[in-house]
Amino acid sequence: MPIEIPSDLTPELVPFAWLLGTWEGNGFMGYGDAEQRAFRQRVTFEQTGLPFVIYRAQTTLLDEEGEPQREATYEQGFWELARPREDGDIGPGMLPPDPVPVLTSAEDVEKLRNADGGFDISVSILQPGGVAELYLGQIKGPRVDLRTDAVIRAQGAKEYQSGTRLYGLVNNHLMWAWDMAADGRELATHASAELTRIEPAAPSGS
């Protein structure tokens, strides 16, 4: 099925068009000696007209019958193309961007394509418990590969060293997998899920 691109989508977000909307589905999590648990997750990738995607994920543990048991965790962040920032871009702080986007056409965006044929991206994700991750990677067609470039932990936060995340669109389902290195262990499987889009991308500003 062709990927639908919202008519009001800023050119810089076209590589992310296949992610936009709300997704829901089930998966499994575990790590080290922790018991493997089934979960349900709702993930939203939202565009507002600015050159970044707002990411939110809500995870609920399931019981042995597959029914919701209790909330597990939330995370949220921002996905964007990794490129040098210019005077017309947002920030620093609350300083707004220029009304006209820095990248105004598909041709401008195409110039950012890397040697592998994809686009370099940065993804910042904040987790409860005082952990913030900065991922670098690429988006190439309906696939995203990410690896942590930096992890910030608040004093008293649990030990978390690094992570990798993989996202892909397979038969119109969003598949993702997360490996992490934590608690002094090497990078290993942590969680994965298969999600179905339940709401299409909303128009910017809605």
Task: List each language-model region with its residue ranges.
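Soluble ligand-binding/transfer domains with enclosed cavities or grooves
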Residues: 2-7, 13-201, 205-206
